[in-house]
UniProtKB/Swiss-Prot annotation:
GO terms for molecular function: ion channel inhibitor activity; toxin activity. Residues 1-17 form the signal peptide. It comes from Conus abbreviatus. The lineage of its organism: Eukaryota, Metazoa, Spiralia, Lophotrochozoa, Mollusca. This is Conotoxin AbVIA. It is found in: Secreted.
């Protein structure tokens, strides 16, 4: 009876460990997509006002019109 109880408790601990590690993986995945979303919000899309290339998602800010460009047009 003691051996069965020990095996049962060991199985419960292993099941709990596997379940909690899966939960952590899901949370890690959510955190990484959250970071990407926040970075996307920090840059300005093409056609919007910019104050330097770092402000634009494309890294191209027209110095004449202060507007984000899709790409550099020579």
């Amino acid at each position: 009876v003691l051996i069965i109880a020990v095996l049962f408790l060991t199985a419960c601990q292993l099941t709990t460990a596997v379940t909690s590690s899966r939960g952590e993986q899901k949370h890690r995945a959510l955190r990484s997509t959250d970071k990407k979303f926040k970075v996307a919000l920090l840059c300005s899309p093409p056609g919007s006002y910019c104050f330097g290339p770092a402000a634009c998602c494309s890294n191209f800010c027209s110095t004449l019109s202060d507007v984000c460009q899709e790409s550099w047009s020579g």
